Amino acid sequence: MGYRNGNYAAFYVSEPFSESSLGANATKDFVSYNMLRAWKGKDNNYPFNDSHDKTYNVRDGSDWEKTLKPRLRKRLDQSKNIIFFLSKHTENSKALREEIDYGINVKGLPVIVVYPELSEKSDIIDCTTKVFRSEVVNLWSRVPVFKDSMLKVPTIHIPYKKDQIKKALENKDFMINSKISAGSVYFYPC
C-alpha cells in the first residue's frame, strides 16, 4: 500500500458522469472540488494532495464492482482524511455512499466537511449557543451513511473559504496517523 498522505475529496456528481459539455460542472459540489484543485495549481504550497491523482481516471461506463469501486477504495486506502463537499445539491449516489461508508467505517478516516453554500462559521453554528444550525443538520440527511457514521471519526465542519479549508487540511487532529478522539463534532470558533 502507498503512503497515506492524500486528501480524498468526496463530492456528488450526477450519474452517469460526463466531463463533456457542462457534464460534471453542472454539479455544484464538483465545481467546489475543482476550485480546491485550482488553489493548489496556483500555489504549490497549498496543503491539498489530491488522492484522485493517485490512480488513473475511470469513466462511468466502467464496471462498478470490477473497476470503479476498487479504484475508489484504493484512493481511500492512500488517504489521510476525507474532504466532503456537502450542499443542498448533494445526492445520495452509489459512489458517494461507498466513499463515505468505506472511508469512515472501514478506514477510520477523519472528515473535513466543507459547505460550498456557506461562507461564514456563523452560517454553520449559532456562535452564542455553539449549536449547529438546523439547515446544516438537515444537510447531513442527504447522505444517511454520513449522518449515521460521522461520530465514529473526528469530523470538522467548515464554511467554503480558502483559508478555513487550508487550516483544516493542515490540522493534524484531522489526519489518520495523528487524529483526535472520535465521538464529537468540531468547528472553529466564531
From Swiss-Prot:
Any one Gene Ontology BP term: defense response to virus
Main location (coarse class): cytoplasm
Phenotype upon gene inactivation: When this gene is missing the Thoeris system does not confer phage resistance in B.subtilis.
Domain of life: Bacteria
GO-annotated cellular components: cytoplasm
InterPro entries per record: ThsB__TIR-like_domain
E.C. code: 3.2.2.-
Pfam families, per the entry: ThsB_TIR
Subcellular location: Cytoplasm
UniProt keyword terms in alphabetical order: Antiviral defense, Cytoplasm, Hydrolase, NAD
Entry-linked Gene3D superfamilies: 3.40.50.11200
EC class: hydrolase
Gene Ontology molecular function, alphabetical: hydrolase activity
Keyword Phosphoprotein in record: no
Chain's role: TIR-like domain-containing component of the Thoeris antiviral defense system, composed of ThsA and ThsB. Expression of ThsA and ThsB in B.subtilis (strain BEST7003) confers resistance to phages SBSphiC, SBSphiJ and SPO1. Phage infection activates this protein, generating a signal molecule that in turn activates ThsA.
Subunit structure as annotated in this protein's UniProt entry: Homodimer.
Stated family: Belongs to the Thoeris B TIR-like family.
UniProt protein name: Putative cyclic ADP-D-ribose synthase ThsB
Native species: Bacillus amyloliquefaciens (strain Y2)
High-level lineage: Bacteria, Bacillati, Bacillota, Bacilli, Bacillales
